[in-house]
């Protein structure tokens, strides 16, 4: 690994300084400074720029998602695994109802070995993010699968102003090296390389995270448009300390930072090629994006210890090995007319050679529960029209049609088969602008998420051998939002939104078990209040509040609370960032207590986390110290409530709180040199 770090450093130093080409104009992304008045289609959408992200101390790459107001990022496993996400009363698991895209490539993985919509953004290099554009709710025609709660588009930097090398070291064996550079003539060639090592603070397991990450892009811009070709490569391996039972800690058997199974962890890679382009013609604007992706994950977990197999333990492996290809094209016209229109098409094909679930001991396979191959294809057409009704009124209306084909070749032929399903999703917004500083929005729409193809064709439970009911291929949702955006002066903006989202009842495929379970329909509504103040040219403050009420529909005997539905989230970021000299950022995040059981008898107590970054900036040098979990809080990063079995416990196990603690306070120092 250290040899790789040295090679990366030498490679970065060999890149020449970029000369700015005449064909590329400078684009300044204002991020949260930009109120989007006159542009937004709903009150809760927004933009976060590179400047916003650069000020944040980050424990892991996934933490960049917390720049979206109301989003909470946690981790119940190792540093190489996808994060657990919370938004608008959803425990999104690893991304089921939140769509994520990077440079036109989808990140959510359908029919994934671990969980539907699995979203792993560990391949993102935070310093290479130019901006992220986010929306919430199912009101936007360009977003389809997994977007009921919202979605985000990451756009990475097309050029780096000067070659840059960044070296980091910190607590628990943390090491990181990053190199970025561009070379420009008629086209701009931009590359970045990253290497990371991390052992973690856990008592019984060293994470031994080793990650290599790189991206390369070639961009050319002309008067008529712009095109880009890009390539990415990411691979990592790690060990993990997963969530642990609270009773073992209370009895002194296990340390709060301990682990019961030292052989957990994973290996993953993601390689991609892609391209995108924009062409302006007399008729309108054409855009196109295309990609191919090679992805693989092997993940070892153990959540119940000895509940299913007291002799060998309950460790299991999940495998996902796939190729993806697809793209999107749009045509927009009427830019200077009262009616601006956009027509788009989106296609995607997932060829999954092997998606499996196996019983293991110390990572060695003992038997298989699922060993399948899946082909899943989707085609979508969408239309959106924005009509200026008067100087104060405008409307946006859209319609999206999605069609899915599922094909499964299962080890058990009874679970093989195919299915087709279509979904029509109307969207609409009405916007009123009483002044140049204020807009009010009313938005409604229909969305959906797809289900795991293995659940769509399921006939026999692979563990019990009993008959099983298949899941619905597509599960619809319906939502609405009423809100306002207000920007009384440049650098000050606020957004207030009252929203509701209903999901149909469904049978859900459980990737950890290979079977299905019934879930009831749900209703969620809430209020969000987001604020940004540029107090002075150097000082800025963000305060975001989110409150949610979530319940299952009906009055079942077991109760109607939604496990993992967080009722309150608050976050605030205070930054001092002059162009040179000292700088500092203080970031506070509070996650309110939330139910872990439908009858509300088990609850998470919530958590509060404070991170600090401080440093000094010179013309070509920057030194920064991150203090993560600055108060050394012992709160839980995430909580679950379920039955597990330890040695000597009854056959049916013990229902208990299972948690993963915050990582203790740690320091990370970074020196960045601009050549």
Question: Which residues are covered by each model-predicted region?
Answer:
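Membrane-embedded beta-barrel scaffold of Gram-negative outer-membrane proteins
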Residues: 276, 285-303, 433, 439-447, ...
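Face-selective signature of the C-terminal outer-membrane beta-barrel domain
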Residues: 221, 226-234, 266-411, 431-433, ...
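Extracytoplasmic beta-strand/coil segments of soluble accessory domains associated
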Residues: 62, 66-109
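Short acidic/polar hinge/loop motifs at secondary-structure boundaries
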Residues: 106-136, 154-155, 471
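C-terminal beta-signal and adjacent terminal beta-strands/loops
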Residues: 593-597, 616-675
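Short strand-turn segments of transmembrane beta-barrel domains in outer membranes
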Residues: 136-141, 150-183, 193, 202-203, ...
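Transmembrane beta-barrel wall of Gram-negative outer-membrane proteins
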Residues: 171-197, 203-241, 263-285, 333-335, ...
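Gram-negative outer-membrane beta-barrel transporters
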Residues: 331-334, 395, 404, 493-503, ...
């Amino acid at each position: 690994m250290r040899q790789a770090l040295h090679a990366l450093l030498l490679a970065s130093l060999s890149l020449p300084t970029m000369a700015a080409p005449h064909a590329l104009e400078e684009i300044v992304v204002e991020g949260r400074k930009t109120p989007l008045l006159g542009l937004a289609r709903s009150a809760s959408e927004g933009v976060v720029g590179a400047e916003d992200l650069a000020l944040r101390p980050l424990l892991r790459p996934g933490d960049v998602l917390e720049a979206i107001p109301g989003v909470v990022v946690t981790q119940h496993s190792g540093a190489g695994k996808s994060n657990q996400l919370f938004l608008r009363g959803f425990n999104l698991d690893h991304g089921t109802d939140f769509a994520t895209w990077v440079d036109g490539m989808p990140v959510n993985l359908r029919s994934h070995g671990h969980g539907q919509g699995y979203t792993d953004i560990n391949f993102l290099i935070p310093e290479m993010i130019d901006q992220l554009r986010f929306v919430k709710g199912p009101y936007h025609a360009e977003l389809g699968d997994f977007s009921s709660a919202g979605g985000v588009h990451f756009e990475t930097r097309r050029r780096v102003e000067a070659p840059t090398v960044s070296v980091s070291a910190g607590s628990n064996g943390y090491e990181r090296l990053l190199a970025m550079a561009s070379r420009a003539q008629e086209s701009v060639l931009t590359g970045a390389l990253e290497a990371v090592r991390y052992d973690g603070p856990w008592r019984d397991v060293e994470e031994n995270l080793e990650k290599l990450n790189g991206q390369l892009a070639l961009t050319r811009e002309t008067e008529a448009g712009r095109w880009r070709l890009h390539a990415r490569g990411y691979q990592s391996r790690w060990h993990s300390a997963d969530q642990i039972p609270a009773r073992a800690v209370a009895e002194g058997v296990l340390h709060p930072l301990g682990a019961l199974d030292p052989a957990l962890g994973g290996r993953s890679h993601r390689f991609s090629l892609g391209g995108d382009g924009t062409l302006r013609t007399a008729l309108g604007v054409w855009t196109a994006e295309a990609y191919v992706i090679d992805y693989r994950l092997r993940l070892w977990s153990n959540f119940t210890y000895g509940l299913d197999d007291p002799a060998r333990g309950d460790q299991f492996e999940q495998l996902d090995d796939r190729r993806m290809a697809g793209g999107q094209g749009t045509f927009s016209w009427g830019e200077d007319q009262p009616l601006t229109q956009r027509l788009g098409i989106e296609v995607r094909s997932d060829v999954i050679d092997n998606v499996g679930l196996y019983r293991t001991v110390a990572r060695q396979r003992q038997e298989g529960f699922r060993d399948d191959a899946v082909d899943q294809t989707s085609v979508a057409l969408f239309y959106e029209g924005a009509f200026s009704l008067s100087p104060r009124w405008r409307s946006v209306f859209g319609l999206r049609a999605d069609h899915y084909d599922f094909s499964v070749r299962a080890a058990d032929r009874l679970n093989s088969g195919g299915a087709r399903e279509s979904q029509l999703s109307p969207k609409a917004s009405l916007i009123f602008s009483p002044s140049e500083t204020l807009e009010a929005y009313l938005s409604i729409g229909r969305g959906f998420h797809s289900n795991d193809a293995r659940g769509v064709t399921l006939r026999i439970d692979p563990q019990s051998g009993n008959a099983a009911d298949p899941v619905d291929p597509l599960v619809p949702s319906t939502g609405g939002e009423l809100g306002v955006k207000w920007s009384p002066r440049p650098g000050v903006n606020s957004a207030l939104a009252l929203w509701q989202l209903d999901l149909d009842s469904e049978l859900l495929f459980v990737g950890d078990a290979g079977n299905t379970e019934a879930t009831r329909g749900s209703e969620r509504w809430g209020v969000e209040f987001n604020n940004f103040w540029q107090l002075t040219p150097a000082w800025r403050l963000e305060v975001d509040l989110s409150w949610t009420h979530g319940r299952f529909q009906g009055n079942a005997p077991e109760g109607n609370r939604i496990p993992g539905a967080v009722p309150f989230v608050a976050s605030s970021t205070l930054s001092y960032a002059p162009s040179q000299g000292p700088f500092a950022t203080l970031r506070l995040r509070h996650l309110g207590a939330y139910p872990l059981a439908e009858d509300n008898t088990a609850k998470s107590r919530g958590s509060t986390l404070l991170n600090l970054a401080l440093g000094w900036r010179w013309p070509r040098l920057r030194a920064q110290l991150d203090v993560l979990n600055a108060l050394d809080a012992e709160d839980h990063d995430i909580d679950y409530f379920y039955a597990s079995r330890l040695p000597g416990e009854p056959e049916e196990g013990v229902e208990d709180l299972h948690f993963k603690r915050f990582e203790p306070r740690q320091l990370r120092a970074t020196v960045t040199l601009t050549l």
